[in-house]
Amino acid sequence: MTKQALPHGLWPSPISPAMLAGGIRLNDVQWSPDGNFLVWSQSLDGKTSLFAKPARDAAFDLSGELNPSGGVGYGGGDFFAGRQGVVFAERNGRLYFKPYTEGLARPITPAFGGCASPVLTPDEHNVVFVHTYENKDVLAIVPLDGSAWPRILRQGADFYMQPAVSPDGKLIAWVEWDHPNMPWDGTRLHLASLDLETGSISNVKLLDGAENTPIFQPIFSPDGSKLAWLSNAGELDQLKLLHLASGEVETLVQDRVLMPPAWVQGIRALAWSPDSQQVFFLENQLGRTSLQSKNLNTSEITTIDTTPFTLVEQPCVSAKGEVALLAQSARKPPRVLRITGGEVEVIARSQSDVLPAAFLSQPEAIDWQSSDGVTVHGLYYPPANPDFEAEGAPPVIVYIHGGPTSQVFDAF
């Protein structure tokens, strides 16, 4: 087909701004501990909803008229998927529990302050969470049935995020930091003994982190023998592993870009295989992210095939070995994916794939030298239209990301 000549900027397109702006925003995805339910969070027109999908049945709405939304800092950390139901933070400042089966969501905390990053203890009798009230952040714990007032587990730092409880319920790890640092500047990773009967912690140990060393996402192995996390003590990141019995710390992966900036609560980049022999991690290269796995027995690193998607986020692995994550590319709108034995299934979409790919530009990773000799990286989006062409170079529109940690990705 012969293309029609028309100057750049005048090519008609079937893609309208309304089509691009009208999609659903996918926020997070998690497996229930037994792998029987896949739960995700999505937002549309200012309303966030939780959906759950059983293995062989259709997805259903969990949150109804409630509006799940983390209330600490800039948000995030909306929910935690348990075996029997979901614990979520509501915009009114309370934590709620909603069973997967029949029954209404019920509040489990009083309505004051804000909650985020709820974590059910393994017996599912208690919830650990981050709470803020009158500019004071703490780690707290509350019975799942709401029968008692929340108790403070840890206070004293200015900020807290990413609490994690060991599979036996006897240990807790978290990240904390103080003004004027941001979480990508410098944080501290702590490990402590957890007493669920008294709702208290003891034997607090500093594992990693400093004023200039940020830490990200402590996560216990399913067998409870190890704790993994991301650290940045230098130019690039490290994936570290603590053997809880011996106290030995080893570096599994280093000199890669692994740690996303913790702009909000609830961001994840790590996951464990159900046999505790593989650690899954995200790697950022040239504006694209990929899912990798590190085999602890062979030390081999394997790339999980998520083709054709170029930005993957929020990885999680079920007790049955199924991977779920959020994925998108420049020509594929965001969606929730389930990966089972190499087979990829779309569980939810931000919008349908009705947009013709030929009208969507495919970015190319490029770099150039600035006037002061610094290598600058970018994504070049060439004009894309199967029906039109133009003479000469197109006009250049330069979009520079904001802030010290923001980045432009090869994404929709």
Where are these regions (language model features)?
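Beta-strand-rich domains and repeat architectures in extracellular enzymes and scaffolds
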Residues: 10-51, 71-80
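Residue-level detector of Asp-centered blade-edge/turn motifs that repeat once per structural unit
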Residues: 33-34, 81-83, 122-123, 167-168, ...
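A flexible loop/linker signature enriched in serine peptidases of the S9 family
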Residues: 42-51, 67-73, 87-96, 110-115, ...
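Short loop/turn segments that connect beta-strands within beta-propeller blades
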Residues: 54-56, 99-103, 143-147, 195-197, ...
